[in-house]
Amino acid sequence: MLEFDTIKDSKQLNGLALAYIGDAIFEVYVRHHLLKQGFTKPNDLHKKSSRIVSAKSQAEILFFLQNQSFFTEEEEAVLKRGRNAKSGTTPKNTDVQTYRYSTAFEALLGYLFLEKKEERLSQLVAEAIQFGTSGRKTNESAT
């Protein structure tokens, strides 16, 4: 497995820096999930991953999990930092508000990764992938 040195003062990184690494982390998790599910054709992989990692999907995942009171107080603070970060660029393919919420989601992923909160990161990603692929939370699947 890849091992990374701890980044000094990762708690102090701005929301966009957290989102930068969070975007990459989420992409790896989603791609791994799709390969594990047996998808191997590049076009299928691209289409399916795009449905989960798009700004719109990430914003929907965030809203869903917030409505479930999924996040801790500390995580909500990170989400707020990510949401309020100003990138200075115009988002492609989505509106500014959706982009800010997806940035918040990615910032939290980046924060959990950099703080080495691996269990919580895995839990969040599992919920996100489940919602992104079916629109339902994992524990609701049984009902």
From Swiss-Prot:
Known EC number: 3.1.26.-
Transmembrane intervals: none
Predominant location: cytoplasm
Keyword Transport: no
InterPro entries per record: Mini3_fam, RNase_III_dom, RNase_III_sf
Record: active site: D23
Annotated localization: Cytoplasm
Keywords per UniProt: Cytoplasm, Endonuclease, Hydrolase, Magnesium, Nuclease, Ribosome biogenesis, RNA-binding, rRNA processing, rRNA-binding
Enzyme class: hydrolase
Any one GO CC term of the record: cytoplasm
Pfam families: Ribonuclease_3
One Gene Ontology biological process: rRNA processing
Entry keyword annotation includes rRNA-binding: yes
Effect of deleting the gene: Cells accumulate precursors and mature forms of 23S rRNA with alternative 5' and 3' ends. Defects are more marked during exponential growth.
Gene Ontology molecular function: ribonuclease III activity; RNA nuclease activity; rRNA binding
UniProt cofactor(s): Mg(2+)
Function: Involved in correct processing of both the 5' and 3' ends of 23S rRNA precursor. Processes 30S rRNA precursor transcript even in absence of ribonuclease 3 (Rnc); Rnc processes 30S rRNA into smaller rRNA precursors. Cleaves more efficiently on assembled 50S ribosomal subunits. Cleavage is strongly stimulated by ribosomal protein L3 (RplC); 20-30% DMSO can replace RplC, suggesting RplC may alter rRNA conformation.
Similarity annotation: Belongs to the MrnC RNase family.
Subunit structure comment from the entry: Homodimer.
This protein's name: Mini-ribonuclease 3
Organism ancestry: Bacteria, Bacillati, Bacillota, Bacilli, Bacillales
